[in-house]
Structure formats: structure tokens, C-alpha cells
Amino acid sequence: MRITGEMGNLAAWEKRLFYMCSARPTLHPRALFSDVTSDYRNPAEPVPGDEVTIRLRTGRYNVDKAYLVVDNVEHVMTRVRSESMFDYYEAKINVGTDKIYYYFKVELGRTVCYYNQIGAIKDLNPYYNFQITPGFKTPEWAKGAVMYQIFVDRFYNGDKSNDVLDDEYNYIGEHVCQVKDWNKYPAQMGIREFYGGDLKGVLDKLDYLEELGIEVIYFNPLFVSPSNHKYDIQDYDYIDPHFGVIAHDEGEVLKEGDTDNTHATRYINRVTRKSNLEASNEFFAKVVQEIHARGMKVIIDGVFNHCGSFNKWLDKEHIYRDSTDEYAPGAFERYESPYHNFFKFYSNQWPDNNSYDGWWGHDTLPKLNYEGSKELEEYILSIGRKWVSAPYNVDGWRLDVAADLGYSPEYNHYFWKRFREEVKKANPDAIILAEHYGDSYEWLQGDEWDTIMNYDAFMEPVTWFLTGMEKHSDEARPDSYGNPDYFFGAMHHNMARMGGQSVAISMNELSNHDHSRFLTRTNRTVGRTNTLGPEAANNNVNKAVFKEAVVMQMTLPGAPTVYYGDEAGVCGFTDPDNRRTYPWGHEDTELIDFHRAAIKMHKENDVLRKGSYKSLYSAYNVVAYGRFTSDDAAIIIVNNNDDEVRARIPAWEVGLGFDDDVEQLLVTFEGGYSTDRLGYHLQNGWLDIGLRKTSAVVLHKMKW
């Protein structure tokens, strides 16, 4: 009250001076930034013995002190550079062999703020500290690389002589069949249906993939297997001749009503005869060689948690027993089999012991018993080496259900450590990429996997935000639809848990062989083919929303991965409907042209491949984020509303100056897209922009 009374007697200028002198300084937390790119950690992937420079960005003259806190010890940082809006602080640390955990602390007057992987925070949470793992290096070629996933049987039939024949063998109780109509939808129980796609078909379409802008081809399983998906491997040493070459083709198919595969002599000859197997391997080596000649890489699928009941080690169907080439007896038939300890049997009911352990109880997917067999462990490790070595020289492995391998967490981690050692020894630049749902932190510590299929920090948050749908189309959640807090919260949490090195090469897919096609998710319809029928997957889809998703795919951190046919407008509920054939001759050419333009933009702007990432703006159904480096910046804005909106974006947060200009690289909207260059002028570091309904726009720093 005394101050109030005295203030009443002061002149106006004296009051202003009083307030200026007594006001607390204001810290600008949105100006704080650091990450694990080379702009803020150099070297970004240090090895033991390196001196590492750690940087922190702050607002210009906006902090009194900045500290790098390493393992809870504060190190004063030095201001080394100033720009119009920012100061940059540095500290140097020496790296040994142990992991290093760090965060930042800044002080301004009595205000204290911390900064870690999820941004500026008031209270510490070591869960999100930055981490240095000495010696953890990820393949440079994979950072931001544009990948393309091919489910081979459904891509293109380039060689009809290797097609699966009607009644060629019996699979899960019924004869297999050859689908004569390429455009037929997969049947609900279509595991016995074969469309005829093969590696010759991929070879024939390499021009298309190259023109699309693809840099990496990821193949679903290629090894010998009785299914069309081939996640039940029969022989890890050979490419399936139905995908490769059948050099010698003789024998009989099954007669009607016959379910005994020992009578399936045509199949036995095709998949067990060494001349066919070796010819298929040779052809695959030529395919990889041609892909490499075009500057592209190859990733193959490794299914090492389980094999198939047809596998030569188990030989439940007795097809190897009757082969013209010599094979050891399978563990299903004889206790004395050299492969007996490759599986876990629960009884001694030989011959034909059906008590083996199946993955999740599936008798067609015998779980491999690594803990019981050193021979099995060494064999699979040799497979890991074989395919990344000459003459095949593939560029990495995608690991199916990798966290399930073995019977204990301890063995699982032990095996993947050995697998990494062996694969990297054979091909140091090979990528090890795992399928995983949930927190992958414990496997991404530099000695097991390089990265993962990015469900948690890409597919799921993008799907929930743009469609409100679960990734199988099994559930709709209105509370997640258009919810920017959920979107950015999920992104920041999961990216932090993965770590920047792994995020940069993670497989960012909108669709794949396990989930509904993203274009189908845009109809926001809960269902599957067995409840709604396949046509329902095509109804009321929204191409404008799909294009928004593709823009996000091409601009968020990671390796954008196109599932074959997505770019051509293929729809589908979850498997098997998501495995429809590529619609050659019936493509959505406008969508293909759009993908080509989006991929071109991604590849031509290095800031979109390797730049830092920062969230900038959020509102209902609207998000904006930036990608930036020390000398470049891009802003991406998505408006998923059915109405036009205006947004005011803090472009200064990604280093754009107060009077900079930005130009439009790509904009999508209902009915199309445009790559016309359109300029915008910033006002005091802010971008005021009108957004079309259901649109996405990519803006880039204009360079003069």
C-alpha cells in the first residue's frame, strides 16, 4: 500500500522507469534448442577418444549463464557466437567407452530452466536426457533415404515359368492355387493364393522405381517358403525358385482330395533340387547388382524368431526325406535328427512328434530354440553374414518380430549383440532395422539394432491425427483425431526414446503388409474384409488427407518408405487385403506424379533429410513444424480442417530472420497439388499465412 501511495505521486515517465527497473527479466524458452545433429554435437557419432563439442542455442542476450550438465556435474558453457536473434554456447567433453548422459541448465536472474530431448522444462526428468553412446555409428546412406517396400508376389509377374501351379502342394489343409486374374482382391483366407510376382518382375520395373526417385528397396521375405508372404521360412540358404529360377521342372501336382505332400513331387523338385536353388541365388545376385548399378540399396527380411513347419530342419511334410538331393532327416520325424535341438519338444512322441513349440501356438510357425542349440545360433549368424557378403552384397536386414527371438530377454539381447558383430564385420555399412512395437530404447544402445520400423514416432501419431483411426482400421478414436497435443506429445516422447541417430534412419511408413492401407484409413471406417467386404476399403477415401500424410512422410525425420502401390492409389483393409496387387495399367497417375514431386523435393533439399526438427504451432487439426540447419530452414504446415484457416507461425524459432522471405516448394489441396513457387515475406520473424482446407504446404528459406 505504501508503494501504491507513492506511485500515485510519480510522473508517468517515472512510473515507467520504476516498472522497468523492478520487472524480472523474461526467459524465452522457445529460443532454447539443441539436438544430436552435427550442428549441436560434433562429431555427432563420436568414438572413444574423441573430443566432442556440445552446443546450445539461446535467445540473444537472454541468459546469464548456461551449463552443460554431464552425469549430474555442471560445466559452465562459453558463448562463442551471436546472431540477430540467438546466442550459441559451447562446452567440450572427452569421450571414453562409457555412455554419457547430459542435459542443459540456463539461468536468467532468479529464473532457472532445463533443456533435454523433449525441449525446455521446469522440472528434471532423466528419462529424456541426451545420450552419447561411444562407437554407435549408423549408415550414412540410410539417413533420410527414400525406401520402397515390395511384397514380391503382388508386385509384377516377370516370369510365368516359375509361377506356383494349381494343386502344386497342400498348405494348411488345402491345395494352393494360382490366381489367373491379376486384379482380383485377395481372399480373406488367401494364404494359399499366388499371383505370380517375382524378382524378374522387380527387375523389369526398375526403370519405374528409379524414375519415382526410390533409393532403397526393402523386400518382404524371399527365401524358400510355402506361403505367399514367406514369413514361414523353409530354407534360409536359398531364394525361393518361385521368385527366382526353376531350371529343372518335373514331377506331379497333387490329385484332387490328396493332402499328402510326399506326393507333391513337382513342388519337391522345384524347392529342394539344388540346381533350382543355386540358379535362384545366382539370379538374385544379378538383381542386386543391377539395383546397385542404379545407385539404389537393398534390404531383405530376416525371420529368425521362428521358421516354418515345412522347414528342412523340421520337415513336417516329409518333402526333404523324398528329395532327389540328400538332406539330413528332420526333427519332426526322428529324434536322432541333427536338428532335434533346434526346436523345443514337449514330449518324446517320435516318429512324427507334433509337440514342438509354435510361436504364439501356431504349429505352422515353429519357434526356434536358440538356448538349446549352439549349432542353431551359429547357423543363423552365418546366414546374417552370408547375404550381406559377396556375391549377394545386400545392404541390410529388416528383422521380423525381433524382440520375440529366444526364450528370455537376456538371450535376446545376447543374440542381437552377436548378430550385429557378425553382420557389421561382414559389411560395416549394412543397416540392422527391426520390427518393433513400443519402447525400443534397450535395443538401440549401439550394440544391437541400428533402428526400427517407426510405428510410435511416425505411423501411429500421423494416422491418429489425420484420420482418428487405429492402424489396422480396427478402432476409431475421436479424441485423437486432429489432436495436436497428442500428436506432438507422441512424436517428442518416442523420438526421444529412440534417440536422434536411430530416428534419422527409421523406416517411416504410412502403410505396410501388416496394417490397413493409409488411403483406406482416410475413409474413417472401422472394419475388415470379413465384416465389410473389400469394396468398402475403396469407398469414401480422401486423397487430400492422404496427400497431407505423404507431405509429412517426406518432411519428418526418418527414411520415408513407400509401400508398393500406395503411390498408385491402392486401398485395402488389414492383411490380407493390404496385399493387393500393384494396379499396372490402372494406376492413379495423378497420385504417382504427386509422389514423384514430393520425393524429388525431399531429395533435393538436404534440410528435409538431415536437418534438426522443431514443433512450431498447433491448433485443432493444424500442426506446423520446422526442419533446419545452420544455413537453411523449411516450415511444414498441415491444415486437416474442412475449412480454410489462418495461422501465425513463429518462423524465427528455426532461424529465419526478421525480414527473410520463404518460398513454397509444394502445396496440396482438395483436387490436386502444386509445385509453383510462391513467395511469403516474414514480419518480425513471424509468418502469417492463410491455409486452404485439407491442405499441406512446404515452405523453404529463399536464397538470393
Which functions belong to the PLM regions below?
Residues 1-151, 157, 165, 200-215, ...:
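Carbohydrate-interacting/catalytic domains
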Residues 152-215, 221-391, 419, 425, ...:
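Substrate-binding/active-site clefts of carbohydrate-active enzymes
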Residues 366-374, 401-420:
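Active-site cleft segment of glycoside hydrolase catalytic domains centered on the general acid/base Glu
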Residues 56, 150, 209, 219, ...:
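Conserved, mostly hydrophobic/aromatic
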Residues 144-145, 212-217, 292-299, 393-397, ...:
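Loop/turn elements at helix/coil->beta-strand transitions in domains of secreted/extracellular proteins
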Residues 223, 304-308, 403-405, 438, ...:
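Active-site-proximal loop/turn and secondary-structure-junction residues that shape catalytic pockets
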Residues 140-142, 310-314, 384-385, 391, ...:
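Conserved alpha/beta catalytic core and glycan-binding cleft of carbohydrate-active enzymes
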Residues 232-240, 268, 363, 529-533, ...:
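Short glycine/proline- and charge-enriched loop/turn segments
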